[in-house]
Design a protein with these regions (language model features):
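Short, surface-exposed beta-strand/loop "edge" segments at domain boundaries and coil↔beta transitions
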Residues: 9-10, 25-26, 102-108
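A short beta-strand micro-motif common to beta-rich folds, especially ectodomain repeats
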Residues: 3, 9-22
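OB-fold nucleic-acid-binding modules
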Residues: 34-178
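C-terminal edge beta-strand
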Residues: 23-36
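Beta-strand secondary-structure signal
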Residues: 2, 15-17, 28-30, 61-63, ...
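Exposed beta-strand and adjacent loop surfaces of beta-rich binding modules
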Residues: 13, 28, 92-94
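Strand-loop-strand motifs at the edges of beta-sheets in extracellular beta-sandwich domains
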Residues: 1-5, 93
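Aromatic-residue detector
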Residues: 14-16, 27, 73-78
Length: 178
Protein backbone atom coordinates (compact mmCIF):
# COMPACT_ATOMS: atom_id res chain seq x y z
CA UNK A 1 0.00 0.00 0.00
CA UNK A 2 1.04 3.62 -0.48
CA UNK A 3 0.85 6.36 2.11
CA UNK A 4 0.10 9.86 0.89
CA UNK A 5 2.42 12.65 2.00
CA UNK A 6 1.26 14.58 5.07
CA UNK A 7 0.61 18.02 3.62
CA UNK A 8 -1.51 19.31 6.50
CA UNK A 9 -0.04 21.00 9.58
CA UNK A 10 -0.98 18.31 12.09
CA UNK A 11 -0.11 14.71 12.94
CA UNK A 12 -2.08 11.89 11.33
CA UNK A 13 -2.56 8.56 13.05
CA UNK A 14 -3.75 5.16 11.95
CA UNK A 15 -4.19 1.82 13.64
CA UNK A 16 -3.18 -1.27 11.69
CA UNK A 17 -4.72 -4.50 12.94
CA UNK A 18 -3.28 -7.91 12.15
CA UNK A 19 -5.19 -11.10 12.79
CA UNK A 20 -4.31 -14.72 12.22
CA UNK A 21 -7.74 -16.26 12.74
CA UNK A 22 -6.56 -19.87 12.51
CA UNK A 23 -4.20 -19.41 15.44
CA UNK A 24 -6.32 -16.91 17.38
CA UNK A 25 -3.51 -14.37 17.28
CA UNK A 26 -4.00 -10.67 16.71
CA UNK A 27 -1.96 -7.51 17.10
CA UNK A 28 -2.40 -3.79 16.67
CA UNK A 29 0.14 -1.24 15.57
CA UNK A 30 -0.51 2.46 15.99
CA UNK A 31 1.30 4.57 13.40
CA UNK A 32 1.77 8.34 13.55
CA UNK A 33 2.69 10.41 10.53
CA UNK A 34 4.27 13.54 11.95
CA UNK A 35 3.87 17.13 10.89
CA UNK A 36 5.96 17.97 7.81
CA UNK A 37 9.35 19.25 8.88
CA UNK A 38 12.39 21.09 7.56
CA UNK A 39 15.72 19.47 6.80
CA UNK A 40 18.62 21.51 8.18
CA UNK A 41 22.19 21.55 6.94
CA UNK A 42 24.97 21.89 9.52
CA UNK A 43 25.54 25.48 8.35
CA UNK A 44 21.85 26.28 8.95
CA UNK A 45 21.97 24.71 12.41
CA UNK A 46 25.00 26.83 13.31
CA UNK A 47 23.34 29.98 11.93
CA UNK A 48 20.47 29.61 14.43
CA UNK A 49 22.79 30.84 17.21
CA UNK A 50 25.20 33.69 16.44
CA UNK A 51 26.48 33.84 20.03
CA UNK A 52 26.34 31.70 23.17
CA UNK A 53 22.80 30.52 23.90
CA UNK A 54 20.19 27.84 23.30
CA UNK A 55 17.63 27.08 20.58
CA UNK A 56 14.71 24.69 21.26
CA UNK A 57 13.27 22.69 18.35
CA UNK A 58 9.65 21.60 17.86
CA UNK A 59 10.46 19.17 15.07
CA UNK A 60 12.68 19.17 11.99
CA UNK A 61 15.72 16.99 11.23
CA UNK A 62 19.19 16.80 9.67
CA UNK A 63 21.56 14.21 8.20
CA UNK A 64 24.94 13.41 9.71
CA UNK A 65 27.67 10.82 10.10
CA UNK A 66 28.72 9.46 13.51
CA UNK A 67 32.43 10.01 14.09
CA UNK A 68 32.72 7.79 17.17
CA UNK A 69 31.31 4.60 18.68
CA UNK A 70 28.73 5.30 21.35
CA UNK A 71 29.43 4.13 24.88
CA UNK A 72 33.20 4.48 24.73
CA UNK A 73 35.20 6.04 27.54
CA UNK A 74 36.90 9.41 26.99
CA UNK A 75 34.01 10.82 24.96
CA UNK A 76 33.76 13.80 27.30
CA UNK A 77 35.18 15.13 30.54
CA UNK A 78 33.77 13.04 33.39
CA UNK A 79 33.21 15.32 36.39
CA UNK A 80 34.62 14.56 39.81
CA UNK A 81 31.78 14.23 42.32
CA UNK A 82 34.18 14.10 45.25
CA UNK A 83 37.86 13.47 45.86
CA UNK A 84 37.35 9.76 45.21
CA UNK A 85 34.26 9.59 42.98
CA UNK A 86 33.87 10.20 39.22
CA UNK A 87 30.60 10.49 37.27
CA UNK A 88 31.28 8.30 34.23
CA UNK A 89 27.81 9.00 32.83
CA UNK A 90 29.07 12.08 30.97
CA UNK A 91 31.17 9.99 28.56
CA UNK A 92 28.52 7.27 28.36
CA UNK A 93 25.90 9.76 27.10
CA UNK A 94 28.12 11.70 24.67
CA UNK A 95 28.85 11.14 20.98
CA UNK A 96 29.87 13.27 18.01
CA UNK A 97 28.33 13.84 14.57
CA UNK A 98 29.66 15.60 11.51
CA UNK A 99 27.98 16.77 8.33
CA UNK A 100 27.97 14.35 5.43
CA UNK A 101 30.48 16.66 3.71
CA UNK A 102 32.77 16.57 6.78
CA UNK A 103 32.84 20.36 7.11
CA UNK A 104 31.12 20.89 10.49
CA UNK A 105 30.62 18.76 13.57
CA UNK A 106 28.75 18.86 16.85
CA UNK A 107 28.59 17.03 20.15
CA UNK A 108 25.39 15.19 21.05
CA UNK A 109 24.14 14.39 24.54
CA UNK A 110 21.63 11.55 24.75
CA UNK A 111 19.29 10.94 27.69
CA UNK A 112 20.82 7.65 28.88
CA UNK A 113 23.83 5.46 28.11
CA UNK A 114 21.41 2.95 26.52
CA UNK A 115 20.41 5.66 23.98
CA UNK A 116 24.03 6.04 22.81
CA UNK A 117 23.83 3.38 20.11
CA UNK A 118 25.53 5.04 17.13
CA UNK A 119 28.66 3.49 15.67
CA UNK A 120 31.47 5.26 13.84
CA UNK A 121 30.55 5.70 10.19
CA UNK A 122 26.78 5.37 10.67
CA UNK A 123 24.97 7.74 8.32
CA UNK A 124 21.88 8.91 10.19
CA UNK A 125 18.83 11.11 10.00
CA UNK A 126 18.42 12.90 13.32
CA UNK A 127 14.99 14.05 14.51
CA UNK A 128 15.21 17.37 16.33
CA UNK A 129 11.84 17.00 18.08
CA UNK A 130 12.24 18.34 21.64
CA UNK A 131 16.01 18.75 21.15
CA UNK A 132 17.96 21.82 22.24
CA UNK A 133 20.96 23.20 20.36
CA UNK A 134 23.49 24.89 22.65
CA UNK A 135 26.27 27.18 21.46
CA UNK A 136 29.26 27.87 23.69
CA UNK A 137 31.88 30.48 22.88
CA UNK A 138 35.67 30.39 23.38
CA UNK A 139 36.00 28.07 21.60
CA UNK A 140 32.83 28.18 19.52
CA UNK A 141 31.24 24.75 19.74
CA UNK A 142 27.76 23.28 19.47
CA UNK A 143 26.02 20.61 21.52
CA UNK A 144 22.66 19.01 20.75
CA UNK A 145 20.86 17.90 23.93
CA UNK A 146 17.61 16.07 24.66
CA UNK A 147 18.05 13.18 22.22
CA UNK A 148 17.08 9.52 22.67
CA UNK A 149 17.78 6.44 20.54
CA UNK A 150 14.39 7.03 18.87
CA UNK A 151 15.73 10.28 17.37
CA UNK A 152 18.13 8.40 15.08
CA UNK A 153 17.25 6.63 11.84
CA UNK A 154 20.30 4.80 10.50
CA UNK A 155 20.45 5.07 6.70
CA UNK A 156 23.64 3.07 6.34
CA UNK A 157 25.51 1.32 9.09
CA UNK A 158 29.19 1.95 9.73
CA UNK A 159 30.22 2.49 6.14
CA UNK A 160 29.76 6.17 5.34
CA UNK A 161 32.30 7.41 2.82
CA UNK A 162 35.40 9.02 4.30
CA UNK A 163 36.02 12.68 3.62
CA UNK A 164 39.68 13.46 2.93
CA UNK A 165 41.14 16.91 3.59
CA UNK A 166 44.61 18.34 3.95
CA UNK A 167 45.84 20.25 7.00
CA UNK A 168 45.59 23.52 5.05
CA UNK A 169 41.83 22.91 4.62
CA UNK A 170 41.20 22.55 8.36
CA UNK A 171 40.22 25.60 10.40
CA UNK A 172 38.67 26.63 13.70
CA UNK A 173 35.21 25.50 12.54
CA UNK A 174 36.41 21.90 12.36
CA UNK A 175 35.86 21.15 16.03
CA UNK A 176 34.20 17.72 16.41
CA UNK A 177 34.96 16.59 12.84
CA UNK A 178 36.98 13.53 11.95
Amino acid sequence: FNVAANEIKSERTATIKFELAEKGVSAELKVTQIIPTKQYSFAELRALLTSAGEYKFDGDWFEAVAVADGGKENMDTDPMLSASSIDYNESATTNYLQGVDGKYGLRIKVATAADNTLKRGDKVKVSLTDATLVREDNPVRYTLKGLTANCFTIESSGNAASVSRTVSQIGDDDIYTL
